[in-house]
Amino acid sequence: MPTRLAALGAAVLFAVAGCSSPADESATIVTPPSPAEDLAELPAASAGGACILWDYDFIEQNLGVRFAVAAADQVDDTSTCVVQTLSAPWPDLALSVVETTKANATIFLDTRMPEKATKLTGLGKAGYRMNTKASGEHGPTVEIGWLSEAKQLQTLRFTFAKDATAADVKDMNAKLLELAKALSTTNG
């Protein structure tokens, strides 16, 4: 009896491992991947980098968009974080933080503010907002950059999906500014 069970176990193992004859296709076992909804959502902060500064609930409360995956990096004194949904490459939201700078408000606006940006008030020592049109496969972007009270350079950039409307962009201008203000504390 144990010999028969061992032989049966070996036959099943060889069949699953692809050692069956080509004519025996029914012996192949295929396990479909789990749907994305079944995956456990890791906190954004678990990605490290600038992701430690926020979580998905905080972002959703400010922007009305639910993100579920985060990636981060740190090079020298610059930390970054990008969050996305599971369903598509856009929208996405990126945050970059340069830990410290010698720039003052004038230097920031003269050298860090993009040419087509609009100066913002009420955000750190100096700030700007820039909207760009859709490009490539993604939609328009809203970018807010500022020099924080703690002398950090911070940038938020929301990239829309291709189908975003002008009203979506206008609405995101206000929401992204509120998120920037929530991130811009006296300590950072």
Regions found by a protein language model. Give the residues of each.
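Bacterial N-terminal signal peptides that target proteins for export
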Residues: 1-8
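A small/polar (G/S/T-enriched), proline-flanked helix-loop surface module common
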Residues: 22-188
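C-terminal motif of bacterial Sec signal peptides marking the signal peptidase cleavage site
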Residues: 15-18
